[in-house]
């Protein structure tokens, strides 16, 4: 935002920006100016800071315009304040999950060597990744391919070394789901840094004698050609610990970082409604009225729930199947904080 006196804003007189495939007229809107008019391969544009206004990408964007006369410099007006509509929030989050699927495909193919997926618990991060990998594994199993593996919980450095060795080939993927402790262990982090190095040849070494390696037939060095996905509830930008932040920065520099942009309770609730509308509860064979009642229960009681998540919706749906006449009372005692 433009609180500093030296920051220039620009008021768009005539200009458009493509949002989800549609040219949106931005006439009258005020943005922080990044770079004045230029002509590119697709015509003229002025570059502004899209992150300053809700509903626009969190980066610099190019607004299409015919000439410098299509906008005016404005040091007096404030940046336009917009609040995202529910539809815009759902579209934004849906776009991120579509990107997550595309990036997971690229990881599986070995085109992308590593990805970090960041988002709050219970919004479908793991499901989005595993759904894609399961589809590829069904095809690869016909040709004798090796399945990917999801690693959860704590892991020692030597355990990590052995796991990487077992999934070292190009078409293999290791998914580290909620394994944040591995980021804090210096030796484990150094192993990951070697595995995800940007060099064409990535060689990992274990430089101390180990009975475990000898016993499992694992060499003390090997070339790693596989890929890795890290699924975490951490938002790397919010980490306060300097030590952990430096560790995460070292990992982030070697990975693509996918932030699912679910930051608020409203974002999370709209994500839950979107996934439910897409058919998440169909397997429970509940009629539409009961499904709507389940969602109303979640929405009304969202501040009292033990966890506002897709998992909680599924728990309540299970109760609606098991106890058709008293599922709400059961849910009040199992998924809500007791007073």
Q: How would you describe each model-predicted region?
A:
Residues 7-81:
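N-terminal accessory interaction module
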Residues 77-110:
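N-terminal pre-Walker A segment at the start of P-loop NTPase domains
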Residues 109-129:
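Walker A/P-loop nucleotide-binding motif
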Residues 137-172, 180-185:
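AAA+/P-loop NTPase substrate/partner-engagement loops
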Residues 170-174, 220-229:
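Loop/turn-to-beta-strand initiation segments
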Residues 184-224, 233:
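Conserved catalytic/switch belt of AAA+ P-loop NTPases
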Residues 242-263:
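A short helix-turn-beta junction within AAA+ P-loop NTPase domains corresponding to the substrate/partner-engaging
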Residues 268-269, 274-338:
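Conserved AAA+ ATPase small/helical "lid" subdomain
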């Amino acid at each position: 935002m433009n609180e500093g006196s030296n920051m220039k804003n620009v008021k768009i007189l005539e200009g458009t920006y493509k949002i989800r495939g549609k040219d949106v007229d931005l006439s009258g809107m005020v943005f922080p100016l990044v770079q004045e008019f230029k002509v590119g391969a697709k015509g003229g544009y002025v570059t502004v800071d899209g992150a300053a206004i809700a509903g626009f990408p969190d980066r610099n964007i190019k607004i299409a315009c015919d000439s410098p006369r299509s906008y005016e410099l404005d040091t007096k007006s404030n940046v336009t304040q917009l609040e995202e509509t529910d539809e815009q929030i759902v579209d934004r989050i849906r776009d991120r999950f579509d990107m997550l699927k595309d990036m997971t495909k690229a990881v599986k193919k070995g085109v992308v060597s590593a990805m970090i997926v960041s988002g709050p618990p219970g919004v479908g991060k793991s499901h989005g990744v595993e759904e894609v990998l399961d589809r590829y594994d069904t095809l690869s199993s016909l040709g004798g391919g090796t399945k990917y593996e999801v690693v959860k919980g704590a892991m020692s450095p030597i355990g990590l070394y052995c796991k990487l060795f077992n999934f070292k080939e190009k078409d293999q993927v290791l998914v580290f789901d909620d394994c944040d402790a591995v980021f804090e262990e210096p030796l484990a982090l150094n192993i990951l840094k070697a595995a995800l190095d940007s060099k064409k040849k990535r060689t990992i070494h274990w430089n101390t004698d180990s009975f475990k390696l000898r016993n499992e037939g694992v060499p003390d060095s090997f070339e790693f050609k596989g890929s890795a996905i890290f699924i975490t509830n951490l938002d790397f930008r919010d980490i306060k610990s300097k030590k952990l932040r430096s560790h995460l920065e070292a990992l982030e520099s070697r990975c693509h970082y996918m932030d699912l942009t679910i930051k608020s309770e409203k974002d999370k609730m709209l994500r839950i409604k979107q996934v439910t509308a897409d058919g998440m509860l169909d397997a429970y064979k509940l009629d539409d009225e009961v499904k709507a009642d389940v969602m109303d229960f979640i929405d009304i009681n969202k501040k009292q729930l033990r966890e506002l998540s897709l998992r909680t919706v599924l728990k309540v749906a299970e109760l609606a199947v098991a106890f058709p006449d008293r599922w709400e009372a059961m849910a009040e005692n199992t998924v809500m904080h007791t007073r």
